[in-house]
Amino acid sequence: MTIKPLIILPDPVLRQQSKLIEQVDAEVLRLADDMLETMYDAPGIGLAAIQIGVPRRMLVIDVAREGEEKTPVVFINPEILKVSDDISTYEEGCLSIPDYYAEVERPASLTVQYVGRDGKQQTVEADGLLATCLQHEIDHLNGVLFIDHISRLKRDMVIKKFTKAARAKI
């Protein structure tokens, strides 16, 4: 397993559409392991493949609380089948937008269909933090960032801040 460098805003890679994974093979499983290692190292609770520069429809999530046993799940080609009408608000952050957090409203629960590590199709019904994390990470697969769900003024300020920081590194 290898810790991969994270793609940081304003890198345009984050706005790419990720492509379907045709087959769960050794390369895909290695990518999943690298993603988990990278996520835990960051540390974070979710990571989409695009965040390490791989435009494939895969994400990893572990919403276990600190001190609890790890419960990593690999979601390949996740697809939202159903969302609730109820809305919940969570303060979200993102490994690709370090040290910035904002309140985001999303459906409180949802049903997601995906392919697991074993190559078999599965379905999960999620609510709470898992539902929010799934929506956040699936957004990444579609080139959407959590800052796209906040006010335009706040989003523009965040993008300006990260663009300025990126220029300073050049």
Curated annotation (Swiss-Prot):
Fe cation binds at C94, H136, H140. Binds 1 Fe(2+) ion. SUPFAM superfamilies: Peptide deformylase. Disulfide bonds: none annotated. Keywords: Hydrolase, Iron, Metal-binding, Protein biosynthesis. The keyword Hydrolase applies. The active site is at E137. GO terms for molecular function: metal ion binding; peptide deformylase activity. InterPro entries: Peptide_deformylase, Peptide_deformylase_sf. Its cofactor is Fe(2+). The keyword Transport does not apply. It is an enzyme of class 3 (hydrolase). It catalyses: N-terminal N-formyl-L-methionyl-[peptide] + H2O = N-terminal L-methionyl-[peptide] + formate. It comes from the Bacteria. Transmembrane segments: none annotated. GO terms for biological process: co-translational protein modification; translation. Its EC number is 3.5.1.88. Pfam families: Pep_deformylase (PF01327). Belongs to the polypeptide deformylase family. Removes the formyl group from the N-terminal Met of newly synthesized proteins. Requires at least a dipeptide for an efficient rate of reaction. N-terminal L-methionine is a prerequisite for activity but the enzyme has broad specificity at other positions. This is Peptide deformylase. It comes from Agrobacterium fabrum (strain C58 / ATCC 33970) (Agrobacterium tumefaciens (strain C58)). The lineage of its organism: Bacteria, Pseudomonadati, Pseudomonadota, Alphaproteobacteria, Hyphomicrobiales. The gene is def.
